[in-house]
Amino acid sequence: GIARGLAQMTSYEVPFALAVIAVVVQYDTASISQIVAAQQGGFMNWTVFTNPFAVAAAMLAFLGMTGYAPFDVVMAPNEIPIGPATEFHSSYLSLMQINRAIFAGAKLVLFMNLFFGGAGNLIELVAKTWAIYMIPVIVGVAFPRFRVEQSVRFFLKIPTLIGVLAIFYVQYIVLK
């Protein structure tokens, strides 16, 4: 139940943290508004083009962050007898589900600001976040559900390696 969910959460937060570190090093700031400002001047200034390794690591981690298939085994219907639905009662379970919905929107906006140049108006915000949201949806339709140990192994291998590459890429290619 919860222990497996925490293991999976930790495993996808590692590559995302590496990607964020790469972006912070690249733009020499941790301020989201300054990172967005540094990406202005055309779409070729977006992090997706200036540091594709960071975006790849973050996007692979984002697949797990959303909690959709194929990384939804913790909250999957067949996990109800041993999952959070039985470990929490009504008020705590509802808070957890509301928390997941709010964080999903916040992660979409954060991802858009860090890697896709931010948004200048509401239409651009909705269009970019919708496009980012569709990536995990399409992956969830295309791939079968992973077991927790499979997803932990996946996140700690490929996306983490790409995240480390992103930091080296920024340090030795972008900043030179």
Regions found by a protein language model. Name each.
Residues G1-K176:
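Alpha-helical transmembrane segments of multi-pass membrane proteins predominantly involved
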